[in-house]
A protein has these predicted regions:
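Hydrophobic structural segments
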Residues: 1-263
């Protein structure tokens, strides 16, 4: 629960990075690659990873790593590489699956717009390059309020008919708690009815790798030279040149061998 006094951003959480954080008075290191990739039963300082762990503990430094989540995120590592290369019409090479759910709820007609907009603000309704996506059907709901309840409409002990709107929208599963909380706070009913459905749809905005097109086709050698210059690297490792022009490019910020079939 300590306050952050300063943060250092780096690709890896190395000893040199930790030393710089200590000397600059910072207590947080933000890295792309995690320091720990396996479990440890003891920490003795026998290698650089254990030395970094000990140094971080002794100096109250928090190490936060955004690795594959940043690789797969919209606007993350792959998007930035594609942007620097100059790719157009980019899309995810391997979109994530089983990450989306559908929310269905039933709201009195007069309050439907307020609830719907609150759900959009909470993170619902994003499909591709569109937001505020929903499907709405008018219908009639029935209920009988029991003793001890505080009905928004109708009387205790009487069957009530209410004009309602069935609102259907989509959301990423990690937003579920926030969205349901928003629904319960915004919905006028004491006991709002809602359903959640798991979806098998691919989430086109999130996933591994990027594929896109160059504005103009380039020779393989021209493309490789431009990549080398753009990313300021000393050398590039590549396969045998084929003599073809390059127009469509697939990329991955990492090894990416698992994406070769998709590419």
């Amino acid at each position: 629960d300590a306050e952050t006094t300063g943060a250092l951003l780096g690709l890896d959480g190395t000893e040199a990075v930790l030393d710089e954080a200590i000397s600059s008075g910072g207590n947080r290191v933000i890295s792309h690659h995690p320091l720990i990739f396996k479990g440890y039963k003891s920490i003795t300082g026998k290698d650089y990873v254990e030395r970094c762990i000990l140094k971080a503990i002794k100096n109250d430094i928090v190490i936060y790593s955004a690795h594959t989540n940043l690789d797969n995120a919209p606007g993350g590592v792959n998007y930035k590489i594609a942007e620097k290369i100059g790719l157009k019409n980019v899309r995810i090479l391997e979109p994530k699956e089983n990450c989306l759910i559908k929310l269905v709820t039933f709201v009195p007609t007069a309050q439907a717009e307020e609830v719907r907009n609150a759900l959009f603000t909470a993170g619902c309704g994003y499909i591709g390059d569109y937001d505020s996506c929903s499907y709405n059907t008018e219908g009639e709901g029935t209920f009988r309020a029991q003793e001890g309840s505080k009905p928004f409409c109708g009387n205790i002990g009487e069957l009530h008919h209410e004009a309602e709107v069935r609102i259907e929208t989509i959301l990423p599963e990690y937003k579920k708690r926030e969205v349901i909380r928003t629904l319960l706070l915004t919905h006028p009913y004491e006991e709002p009815a809602y359903d959640l459905y798991p979806l098998y749809n691919s989430w086109a905005q999130v996933g591994a790798g990027i594929i896109g097109e160059l504005k103009e086709a380039e020779s393989e050698l021209e493309f490789l030279k431009r990549i080398k210059k753009t990313f300021e690297v000393g050398c590039l490792k590549h396969n045998k040149l084929t003599g073809r022009l390059i127009q469509k490019v697939a990329l991955c910020g990492g090894a990416g061998a698992f994406l070769i079939p998709q590419a």
